[in-house]
Regions:
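Active-site bordering "gate/hinge" segments
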Residues: 1-174
Length: 176
């Protein structure tokens, strides 16, 4: 689709304009559009339209024989109109900034050490570790290690996980 190609071309241009050390730009766009109809046995009907879009950009920067990368992106339960030029500029700036920081970075420390994860995207680690087993379809079919365990402790004391499908415009959000 021509509009999507133009969007990616704009994103590439914004990234290259940010810093002359940018030698490569890789941009990706993805989207889906679902129409969901739920029909209960009592005749109640509920419908939802669920768009989902995502754009990402990765840049390679080179300086003094060293090459580093940075990436950024975003999206959510929107249509492609979500990706304004201002938003695309933000993604390009963030990717270039990350690559620039990486160019100036020294070696990372190595070895065993404590790690503290804050809220937000680190939740992906949690999702990959246990999240798929918590998804409704696996539990409905009884194929999850968590099937039939509602109300029971399934993690170490002190671990609390809340899956909130009411957060607006997020990937796992529901509006019905």
């Amino acid at each position: 689709d021509t509009a999507k190609v133009k969007l990616l071309e704009r994103l590439e241009g914004f990234a290259r304009e940010e810093d002359p050390r940018v030698s490569q730009v890789m941009a990706h766009i993805a989207g889906s559009w679902e129409v969901v109809l739920v029909a209960r046995a009592d005749g109640h009907l509920a419908a939802d339209v669920r768009p989902l879009v995502r754009v990402s950009v990765t840049v390679i920067m080179e300086e003094a024989g060293r090459r580093e990368q940075g990436s950024a992106g975003g999206g959510g339960r929107y249509d492609y109109g979500f990706f304004s030029d201002e938003r695309l500029h933000e993604y390009a700036r963030a990717a270039v900034h990350q690559a620039s920081v990486n160019l100036a970075a020294g070696p990372a420390p190595a070895g065993t050490m404590p790690v503290v994860l804050g809220p937000g995207w680190p939740g992906i680690l949690l999702h990959e570790a246990i999240g798929h087993g918590l998804e409704g379809d696996f539990n409905r079919k009884g194929s999850s290690a968590f099937s039939g365990r509602i109300g029971q402790q399934v993690a170490a004391r002190g671990v609390t996980v809340v899956d909130d499908g009411t957060l607006p415009d997020r990937r796992g959000s529901l509006s019905i």
